[in-house]
């Protein structure tokens, strides 16, 4: 999935719906930086977390 993510896309973390919608900032070597509405910028390991496109 992470190979399809590009900066600017809107995503949601199904394990943490309370984070709200996030905008992908960058994708580098499996690490996805996302700026979520409710918690701010989070770096996610794309090998361990599956994000949903909004």
Positions of PLM-derived features:
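Basic/aromatic-rich interaction segments and small domains that mediate binding to polyanionic partners
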Residues: 2-54
């Amino acid at each position: 999935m992470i190979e399809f993510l590009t900066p600017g896309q809107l995503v949601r973390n199904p394990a943490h719906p309370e984070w709200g919608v996030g905008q992908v900032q960058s994708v580098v070597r499996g690490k996805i930086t996302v700026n979520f509405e409710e918690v701010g910028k989070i770096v996610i390991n794309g090998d361990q977390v599956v994000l949903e496109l909004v």
